[in-house]
Amino acid sequence: MITQIDRKAIRMKKHKRVRKSVFGTAERPRLAVFRSLNHIYAQVINDELGVTLATASSLDAEFKAAELAGGNVEGAKKVGDLVAKRALEKGVSKVVFDRGGNIYHGRIAAVAEAAREAGLEF
C-alpha cells in the first residue's frame, strides 16, 4: 500500500528542532515567518518576555492598498519590507531569522531578502 507523505508534520518536526536553538532576546528578537497557501505572515518576537514587537502580513491594509497577492514572491517581498520598517520604528535593527521549518526558498527567502534590504541585520 502506498502511504502519503504528511508534509505539515515534517515541517512541524523541523520547526521544533530549529526552535531549540533559535531564541529571540531583547537585543536580537526573532523574525518568525509563517507561510500558508494564500498568505504570508511575519512577526518580530522577544521570546524572553513573550512579546510581539512588530508584525506584518498579506492581510494588512497597507499590503492590500498595494494590490498584491499574498501567495507569491512579490507579495512576500512587500511583507518583508513592511515588517522591517515597523521593527526599525520600534528600535530593532538586529534579528534572528526563524524560517518556521520551511525551506529557505521562494517566499521565505523573499521575506528575508526584503527585510535585509529595508535595514534589518541577520
UniProtKB/Swiss-Prot annotation:
Keywords: Ribonucleoprotein, Ribosomal protein, RNA-binding, rRNA-binding
The organism's place on the tree of life at top rank: Bacteria
Keyword Ribonucleoprotein: yes
Gene Ontology molecular-function annotations: 5S rRNA binding; structural constituent of ribosome
One GO CC annotation: cytosolic large ribosomal subunit
Cross-referenced Pfam families: Ribosomal_L18p
Protein's GO biological process: translation
Membrane spanning stretches: none
Function as written in the Swiss-Prot or TrEMBL entry: This is one of the proteins that bind and probably mediate the attachment of the 5S RNA into the large ribosomal subunit, where it forms part of the central protuberance.
PANTHER family to which the protein is assigned, alphabetical: 39S RIBOSOMAL PROTEIN L18, MITOCHONDRIAL (PTHR12899), LARGE RIBOSOMAL SUBUNIT PROTEIN UL18M (PTHR12899:SF3)
Quaternary organization: Part of the 50S ribosomal subunit; part of the 5S rRNA/L5/L18/L25 subcomplex. Contacts the 5S and 23S rRNAs.
Family: Belongs to the universal ribosomal protein uL18 family.
HAMAP family listed in its UniProt record: Ribosomal_uL18_B
Designated name of the protein: Large ribosomal subunit protein uL18
Protein source organism: Desulfitobacterium hafniense (strain Y51)
